[in-house]
Amino acid sequence: MRSAYTRRLFYDLRVESVVSNKLDAVHDVLLMGPGPSCVYPDVYRALAHPTLGHLDPLFIAIMDDIKTLLRTLMQTTNRATLPMSGTGSAGMEAAFVNLVKPGDAVLVLVNGVFGKRMAEVAGRLRAQVYTLEFDWGTPVVPETVAARLQMKDYALVAVVHAETSTGVRNPVDKIGESVKMSGALYLVDAVTSLGGIPVHMDAWGIDLLYSGTQKCLSCPPGLAPLSCSERALAKLRARTTPVPNWYLDLSLLLSYWEGAKRAYHHTAPINMLYGLYQALQCVMAEGLENVYARHRNMHELLVAELGKLGLEILVEPDYRLPMLNAVKVPAGVDEAGVRARLLGEHSIEIGAGLGPLAGKIWRVGLMGHTARAVNVQRLIEALRAEL
């Protein structure tokens, strides 16, 4: 007669043998949409390393290296530079909950979905939200921003660097000049831009910048690199009410991320941080200028090959993003059908348009590890077969 332990073990093995695991059906898909991007093989290997405790000395050393690597990538000396636990949207939420108080006048520059989302988050914090809107597919105009800033004082001005919904690169450097003169804090969404095009946080006068790991860093989604200037930290320290989100409170998180003695805040996503650490190592090994040149060259190759198929880019050349290409859908073409066939027949994923651009564009990503000539050619051959 089997013991209770043996019966239980037998039952567990029997269940394991008959229950299907849907992970067995996961296969390689060429991710050429607006994110996530293809993950570096070295990052997959890093994710599989044994999990350490979140206060283990070796893990603390890895955390410190991550901060240094992020500062190099963001071109900043900010002490408060760290990856938040959560996707890029957590980074956005963290930026606003730490810097915005009820009643603050906040100006959000909007030319796509993610600018609108910034305005919504600020509104939920009961800020006085003002928007300055531009046509989707066109950049924010610095002169228009400068004129608005002369009309009213704002506590904070927010803009998206790389508007993922449209493929537009906003001139955050020029915008920053006017924001600095106004005295407002300057908040920039770099979710898609970081690691794909140059970001100069300090030189551009940015007070708080956030990003995500799943775009040009070619790491799985789950972390939001963020950096905060001393000026922004001063506003945080001057708060007379608590930050309204405990999990994203930078004043608490910094006690875990810096200093000789670390204070527990929450259990860090250990293996995701391994992945980010390795992804940053991959970027630095290639060299920042080489990484930016690769994105630019693959964009130019894609545009040239799309042109041979009669396909056009929505955005004017001077403001195009190399890593996110908004491709106009030709008249009479079933854009959703093409996307479905690319995924089903060719294992290639591209994105659809959003908002007023829904049904009018495809969003083709060339982010991070995805930005390779072999991937561009594979997509072009698939489009040639399906159009």
Tell me the role of every PLM-derived stretch.
Residues 22, 356, 360-387:
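PLP-dependent enzyme catalytic core of the Aspartate aminotransferase-like
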Residues 28-85, 89:
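A glycine-/small-polar-enriched, mobile loop at the entrance of the PLP active site in fold-type I
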Residues 38-39, 214-303:
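Active-site C-terminal subdomain of aminotransferase-like
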Residues 79-107, 111, 115-119:
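Conserved beta-loop-alpha segment that forms the PLP phosphate-binding cup at the N-terminus of a helix
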Residues 139-195, 208, 216:
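Active-site phosphate-binding strand-loop segment of PLP-dependent enzymes
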Residues 202-214:
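Conserved active-site segment immediately N-terminal to the catalytic lysine
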Residues 312-345:
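Conserved PLP-binding catalytic core of the aspartate aminotransferase-like
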